[in-house]
């Protein structure tokens, strides 16, 4: 190992321009070679030290050859560099010649001592980089140059038979960790050119005419058999070192490459930060909540959540944000910019993350799985909200009534009940809504618009949600079948709701009267009977209704539209339910049976009235005399006795 210590023994000077080396100095004068057996005895740190010192020595030798012309004319003892190929002295060697020499030497460090370093000729145009023109080379430039040259000269030297010999142990030291074959999908076919000794003169001629603007990624073009340039080429897959043609200046401005994904960076510190994505390292931790981050800037932004600091303010509306990226996204609401478009359906988005999550609706990808019930979701936020079903967490509280919600959107909707705010008004009927989405759905009742089309069967839907539900019929291979009636569903949750019909389960209970319901929507509608809320108003007559469908049916009175016709007698009806009831007159169907006496009825209202005979219930009471009746029509006739009104007059 004494050779390692000898490597550093190169003449140096403490002042610039005071070095004087007698005679011709070549890189071989300061280089030390190991045999293959000696090289295998070195550990990784010793090999890195060897390469580091060799590059440092080469930097020193090169700097001696790049003094200014004025200094070169005045100095009495000028260093001269001899090319390793010809051994001829020259005062002003071309930078590509120097780099070619050192590349040959470094790539063959394992050659036996005393042998002439030899490498099948490489296109030295690749070595003619912009940073070669600098008078003083930096170590990182040479290091980056050598590594990039190795990556492009031989991605896998044992495969290419044109090279003539395997590259030495330095190549094994520089190359990244082994990557399983086929893991990288983006491969580039590159035709590499290597030259024999007899083509050296032609290669040199070509090198002298080369422009210093050549870059390594232009290698396939340079080695395509131009004027005065002969090449023997072979095709080779560069799985590990494939470089996109758009990555110009990678060797000039981005010399640091990631071995995991092939991405290039201009600074080594940026590469280290990037590599934390592959390793999962998060060295920056929040002292408040313990959350970790891979960058200090991300931690700084996160700390503003605890401190409440919002330094980035919108000049349009004055809204402030904790990070600059949030401000930029917000400003698109003022400019109306929607820069991200879905290639499948053409839908536009303000944020790229929204586009990515939206595209999962086309691919049916659901990467986020619940650990409790194994249900999968396409959005991480949806998974977070779903997990609150298992934990029972409801972090959003209403300040007016204290009611809690698992989602902030539900709290916002609920708060409008207390304020009575209904900012969204229908231009056709004047109906107002708390949410814009509800207004848009309502407006389709006037236009009969069905904008969402299924690409599989061509069916149209009024709401996007209905299209998503329908599309599962085509994409889902597994269906959930009811064991009682055999009905199938695309979702397990829908099957569970359906099974309540057979089991009679009613999990949603009213806190006012204790009545239970199968579905939450029915409970919400029922609660309006206690609150007296009638949110749906008719724009024609001002009448209010508890349900939107009741309003829709009522509005047909004003329009006199009767779209439902009886095919037996031709009678028309404004509601489909009325047509169904009427058709029982022709069919004689009586589907409603009394459990006490077995009497059947064609309408459920008639059955309810009949049951009062058995129960003795008289819910309709006269406010004048207190007499009670089982039917509201009987109460109406009775009240005429108190008023003296005689509404029925004989026409004769």
Swiss-Prot record:
InterPro entries in alphabetical order: KRAB (IPR001909), KRAB_dom_sf (IPR036051), Zinc_finger (IPR050331), Znf_C2H2_sf (IPR036236), Znf_C2H2_type (IPR013087)
Zn-finger region bounds: C2H2-type: 256-278, 284-306, 312-334, 340-362, 368-390, 396-418, 424-446, 452-474, 480-502, 508-530, 536-558, 564-586, 592-614, 620-642
Example GO BP: microautophagy
Localization per record: Nucleus
The keyword Metal-binding is assigned to this record: yes
Keyword tags: Metal-binding, Nucleus, Repeat, Zinc, Zinc-finger
KRAB domain sequence ranges: 25-100
One Pfam family here: KRAB
GO cellular component: nucleus
GO molecular-function term, one example from the UniProt record: zinc ion binding
Origin superkingdom: Eukaryota
Similarity remark: Belongs to the krueppel C2H2-type zinc-finger protein family.
Function: Transcriptional repressor. May play a role as regulator of the ubiquitin-proteasome system and autophagy-lysosomal pathway.
Protein name: Zinc finger protein 418
Origin organism lineage: Eukaryota, Metazoa, Chordata, Craniata, Vertebrata
Gene designation per UniProt: ZNF418
